[in-house]
Amino acid sequence: GSPMTKDLGITLSSGTTVAKDCLDDLDRGSFPTSTGSLRSFWVAHIDGNRTVIGGGLDCIDVGDRIANSDVVSIKRLVGNSLESKDLVTTRFYLATTTQSAYLFKKGEAIPGTMINPQLWEYQHFIYYLSPNSKNGNPELRKRYLTPGGGSLLIGGAMAEGIEQMRILLGVDDSLVPDGEIDRYVATNNVTGQEWSEG
């Protein structure tokens, strides 16, 4: 499909704003913008001073970061299409037809021009390592997008004792991409073009 760019095939409701959104290095948050396509997958590196290389991710306090580790951001649609009765107030959704897409939260009306749209849950998850507040041991944590507060921390650790998280990304260097990985690179060596192809 086409990249998700605001006003180029996808429209956002007035409710698709969040107070505490997690922005990437290009100041793009959870939702598509008109300044570039949505990154469905992005990884940032936290250096030895617990600073995000390239900027972004201010939603994670410096004291809640583990040095020399990566942060993973994933934006996606979930599972099977839903019925309107199945929507919940703590999530965002994407209504789609063959002609258009509309991002909204429960309680907002879908445009009448969208005949029989399919409804999908839209998610933005952020995974990172953080020191445990009681003993300082590193643990894997997860933040998720909500209509009420933006990027919220899920209570408790997903896994404990993970000292570092480093992601290597496979890059297809073929002139005409063939889907085969030609090399693996660290997150801070991925080019803007490679992120947009990912």
Regions found by a protein language model. Give the residues of each.
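N-terminal pilin/flagellin-like segments and related low-complexity appendage regions
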Residues: 1-198
